[in-house]
């Protein structure tokens, strides 16, 4: 069967369902595909199909995630739904599923529960910009005032974690009712998708961001100079543009890209996703190395102290068998290199057990080009024992 051409005419947005266990995330995901499939904009996926999510491995961590896709009149969506709470923690911290926005599912029968709060906090830590709320199971609550109270609680909770509690759309519905074809509740799904379309911003495409390329390898072309190779992470770089070499040293080095090539062909410019070699003017073989980045001047700095949200792998995932403690010194793997760092655990946390999610401060022995949202792995003796996301830069 011939593969269908991917439609690029609609902007693409990644979203996901988050919320407490059994509040109806997976049922809602199924209901969205059902309602949109009747408009020709999705393929219906039933609950069982989504719930039996295949195991994926991302940076050595086993995550169960279901991916569905659908579209509205305005956008194409990739939607991720995870069966278990631990899967969300891992998914969001490793960036396995980058979310441009989230649908927070809260059962009107229960109101906000512990994982509701945890998922909102996680969304804040990993930089999910906007959250739309779906109040589920409204068909099981007789009293509208009860639902009003739940809505107020959720708005307060969003505000507490620096989301737009006042302005966030809150849609009342019943995912099960919509799955069963009840027109009152299929209407709520359409209302939800309209809110997602309008409220969740279209992400800036990687190509439109400022240029950054992690250096993977360096070699010399006799008579021409030094070439740094790597995959452009974001932005665009043109021949004869000035860039900075950043990381592993206190100060960046300025240089000019005098040539670009990909697959042995010369390029005028390189864009996010391209694997390229960049010829650098006046740079000797030893002043650029793997683990540094090339970037647009002034856009990213090298840092040594950062706060991060970290997930410690379980023993089954190949992680440690025992906990680690304050002042633990593993290797932190950023983009293309390992740098040793020392962990400071928050007050009141004596140790981190395999399977824990914890916020910590990290002091690196060499400066690395990082910013809020940068993902990394934690390694010990060459094996991955954790994964993290930078929450803030301290120094």
From Swiss-Prot:
One CC-aspect GO term: cytosol
Domain (tr-type G): residue spans on this chain: 10-204
Protein's name in the database: Elongation factor Tu
Principal location class: cytoplasm
Subunit details: Monomer.
Record PANTHER family: ELONGATION FACTOR TU, MITOCHONDRIAL, ELONGATION FACTOR TU-RELATED
Gene Ontology molecular function: GTP binding; GTPase activity; translation elongation factor activity
Localisation per UniProt entry: Cytoplasm
Region G4, annotated ranges: 136-139
Signal peptide region: none
UniProt catalytic activity: GTP + H2O = GDP + phosphate + H(+)
Region (G5): 174-176
Amino-acid positions noted as binding Mg(2+) in the UniProt annotation, renumbered to this chain: 26
Region (G2), start-end ranges: 60-64
Keywords: Cytoplasm, Elongation factor, GTP-binding, Hydrolase, Magnesium, Metal-binding, Nucleotide-binding, Protein biosynthesis
Stored Gene3D superfamilies: P-loop containing nucleotide triphosphate hydrolases, Translation factors
Organism domain of life: Bacteria
Family: Belongs to the TRAFAC class translation factor GTPase superfamily. Classic translation factor GTPase family. EF-Tu/EF-1A subfamily.
Function in brief: GTP hydrolase that promotes the GTP-dependent binding of aminoacyl-tRNA to the A-site of ribosomes during protein biosynthesis.
């Amino acid at each position: 069967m011939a593969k269908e051409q991917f439609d690029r005419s609609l902007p693409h947005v990644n979203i996901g369902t988050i919320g407490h266990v059994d509040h109806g995330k997976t049922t809602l995901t199924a209901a969205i595909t059902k309602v949109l499939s009747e408009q020709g904009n999705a393929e219906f996926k039933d609950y069982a199909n989504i719930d039996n999510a295949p195991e994926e491995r991302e940076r050595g961590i086993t995550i169960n995630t279901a991916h569905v896709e659908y579209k509205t009149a305005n956008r194409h969506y990739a939607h991720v739904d995870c069966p278990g709470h631990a899967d969300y923690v891992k998914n969001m911290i490793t960036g396995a599923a980058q979310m441009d926005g989230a649908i927070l599912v809260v059962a009107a029968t229960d109101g906000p529960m512990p994982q509701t709060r945890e998922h909102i906090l996680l969304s804040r830590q990993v930089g999910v910009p906007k959250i739309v709320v779906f109040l589920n199971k409204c068909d099981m609550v007789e009293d509208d005032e009860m639902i009003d109270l739940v809505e107020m609680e959720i708005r307060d909770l969003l505000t507490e974690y620096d989301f737009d509690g006042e302005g966030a759309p809150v849609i009342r519905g019943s995912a099960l009712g919509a799955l069963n074809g009840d027109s009152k509740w299929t209407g709520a799904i359409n209302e939800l998708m309209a809110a997602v379309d309008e409220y969740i911003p279209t992400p800036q495409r990687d190509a439109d961001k400022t240029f950054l390329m992690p250096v993977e390898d360096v070699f010399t072309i006799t008579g021409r100079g030094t070439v740094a190779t790597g995959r452009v992470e974001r932005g665009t770089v043109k021949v004869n543009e000035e860039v900075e070499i950043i990381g592993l040293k206190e100060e960046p080095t300025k240089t000019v890209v005098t040539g670009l090539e990909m697959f042995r062909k010369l390029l005028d410019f390189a864009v996010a996703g391209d694997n390229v070699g960049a010829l650098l003017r006046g740079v000797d073989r030893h002043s650029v190395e793997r683990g540094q980045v090339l970037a647009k001047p002034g856009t990213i700095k090298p840092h040594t102290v950062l706060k991060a949200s970290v997930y410690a792998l379980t023993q089954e995932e190949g992680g440690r068998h025992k906990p680690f403690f304050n002042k633990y010194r593993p290797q932190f793997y950023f983009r293309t290199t390992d740098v040793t760092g020392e962990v400071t655990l928050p007050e009141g946390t004596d140790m981190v057990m395999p399977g824990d999610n914890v916020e910590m401060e990290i002091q690196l022995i060499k400066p690395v080009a990082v910013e809020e949202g940068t993902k990394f792995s934690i390694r010990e003796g060459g094996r991955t024992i954790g994964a993290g996301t930078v929450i803030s830069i301290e120094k």
